[in-house]
A protein has these predicted regions:
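Short, surface-exposed beta-strand/loop micro-motifs that present aromatic residues
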Residues: 39, 142-148, 397-406
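PEST-like, low-complexity acidic/proline-rich intrinsically disordered segments
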Residues: 1-14
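Detector for long, low-complexity, acidic/polar
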Residues: 32-34
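Soluble acyl-CoA-dependent acyltransferase catalytic core bearing the H(X)4D motif
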Residues: 11-28, 42-43, 47-76, 80-366, ...
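Low-complexity, glycine/alanine/valine/leucine- and proline-rich hydrophobic stretches
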Residues: 364-433
Length: 433
């Protein structure tokens, strides 16, 4: 490393190099890549951090060289956002400006990091590279990477990607391909970057699905709490036994049509607990939106190896009073019915809605739940074993993420979300079954 930047606090010092641009290590297609309205609604950077217990002196070079080779397959990630003649956003694959890559070292052991599922933003910023042009849409890189070595021999890999390029499932495919190439193997997944099958219909046809995409207001004045109080982002532990008890409760009070999944019952618990912790008024509309992968619903039209966004957000909508008064089995039925509504027509309606209306942020009366429990990041073996932990940061107050907890029975779950300080203890008590 030639030049370094020091990032220091009372506990942790990270010394990192100036970024170098990693380019695809071979010829790649040129031109521009179509972005769907779904992609354009996802214009936000997402940081993730992976911890690895061991590496060696070559870890940085191996990962950097593998990045260059994997970008031959995932070349749009080396491009930049641009606008076409109609003012629509695309990815410019002509210039190939590359992916900023940073090498860093920390003054501690990797165990000192503790639980990284929801890192404080000040700590996270030490281990991921945020490009200074991040807010300049047509200049900023779509992907950055930072490898940080620790005194114990372990390392972290911090990745920041623009969500317009990929959802969680496609991100897993990219990371697996990167790791395979680092181990000297060919990539087992060949991505397809054609997104034109997600073009909106002319004219738009939204129909009965409008309420699934609309926003709801805040008549409970919850926004004031968020503005006046610190927002506490925290990981709440739900063990497998609690989850089994909850599933039994959700199917024994006579309201359930059938058994429900861990995701559904956990979503019901969190939605109800958050609604009560935020002290929503009985007639306040509360909205639960669930990230649902629509790949299985679009098999006839989706190209093999599709790389991009393929999620929709079906909605459950009711008043806070209705939600709190009903048995949890009724809440799980709401959620199951919302998920069951996702078919090709729903997906097409969502695309049309996103093309017709400008994006508006969700208000605090809404909760958006995403599950990372099924994302198999344990196979990201760059040559020294897979990652022990996965973490994130920069969640919005409306976001909630379910993650797997490391446990013997593999059934424990971490619920990660942010709340106003005054609501944290109440939420904690309500999710303890």
């Amino acid at each position: 490393m030639v030049a370094f930047e020091n990032t220091t606090d009372n506990v942790l010092t990270v010394e990192r190099s100036l970024p170098v641009e990693v380019l695809p290590g071979g010829e790649t297609p040129r031109g521009s890549l179509f972005l769907s309205s779904m992609d354009c609604w996802a214009l936000a950077v997402v940081p993730t951090l992976y911890t690895f217990d061991r590496g060696d002196a070559n870890v940085v070079d191996v990962i950097k060289q593998a990045l260059s080779r994997v970008l031959v397959h995932y070349y749009p990630l080396a491009g930049r956002i641009a606008k076409n003649s109609l003012g629509k956003l695309t990815v410019d694959c002509e210039k190939k400006l590359g992916v900023p890559f940073v090498e860093a070292s920390a003054n501690c052991d990797i165990e000192d990091m503790g639980d990284i599922k929801m890192l404080d933003s000040d700590i996270l910023e030490k281990f991921v590279y945020r490009d200074p042009t991040e807010k300049m849409l047509e200049v900023t890189p779509l992907l950055t990477a930072q490898v940080t070595r620790f005194k114990c021999g372990g390392f972290t890999l911090g990745v920041v990607v623009n969500h317009c390029m990929t959802d969680g499932i496609s991100a897993i495919d990219f990371m697996n391909s990167w790791a395979e190439i680092a181990r000297g193997k060919p990539s087992s997944f060949i991505p397809c970057h054609d997104r034109t099958f997600l073009k909106s219909r002319v004219p738009p046809q939204i129909g009965d699905h409008y309420n699934d995409f609309a926003r709801v207001g805040d008549i409970s004045n919850m926004t004031t709490s968020w503005e006046r109080e610190p927002t506490v982002f925290k990981s709440f532990h739900i063990n497998g036994e609690k989850l089994a008890t909850l599933k039994k409760m959700a199917t024994t009070d006579g309201q359930a049509r059938s058994n429900c999944s861990s995701f559904v019952v956990l979503s019901a618990l969190v939605w109800r607990a958050r609604t009560m912790a935020l002290k929503m008024k009985p007639h306040q509309l509360t909205q639960l939106l669930i990230y649902v992968d629509f790949r299985p619903k679009m098999k006839e039209h989706m190209p093999d190896g599709y790389f991009g966004n393929a999620v929709v957000l079906p909605c459950c909508l009711c008043t806070a009073g209705e939600l709190i008064d009903e048995p949890i089995s009724s809440t799980t039925e709401r959620i199951k019915k919302a998920i069951e509504r996702v078919d090709e027509d729903f997906v097409r309606s969502a695309i049309d809605y996103m093309d017709k209306y400008r994006f508006e942020p969700y208000r605090v009366s809404s909760l958006l739940i995403s599950s990372w429990m099924g994302l198999d990041y344990g196979d990201f073996d760059f040559g020294w074993g897979g990652p022990r932990q996965l973490g994130t940061g920069n969640l919005l107050p409306t976001d909630c993420v379910f993650m797997r907890e490391e446990s013997e029975n593999k059934k424990d779950v971490a619920v990660v979300l942010g709340l106003p300080l005054s609501a944290v203890n109440t939420f904690q008590e309500l999710v303890q079954i």
